[in-house]
Amino acid sequence: MRKNPKTVAPGTSVRSAAKHMRDERVGSLFVKKGSLFLGIVTDTDLVRRAVATSKDLNKLTVEDIMTTPIATIESTRGVQDAHDMMGDLGVRHLGVTVAGTIMGVISVRDLLVYYQRYSEPKITQD
């Protein structure tokens, strides 16, 4: 899980958001107005809802392509719960909440790293 997830304002251009994601090395940004989380924009959203539409990426905003509502999971839940929720909802990022407030984000990549680190090897050499 990444604490203090990266955010952008709703009026941020898709081009600017893409550069921000690249610079921060993240696959998602929460769209936030003041203290209110409005939605999430992911690398997949950028491709499917922006680039693939041939719209002007300087004029199209993250508010135009964001996913809302944000799929969230309480911080007390386990990794398997996050895995199951992502599969059930068809998402690759979940907002992680503490008492209902988004405090972090967990991604499929985080799950892969966890499972790689903590699972037993399945193939052995003799």
PLM region spans:
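Cytosolic regulatory modules rich in charged/polar residues
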Residues: 75, 102-103, 107-126
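A glycine-centered beta-loop-beta connector
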Residues: 21-24, 29-45, 86, 94-109
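Short, charge-rich, low-complexity interaction segments located
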Residues: 53-60, 120
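Short beta-to-alpha loop/turn elements within the nucleotide-binding domains of ABC transporters
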Residues: 12, 41, 60, 77, ...
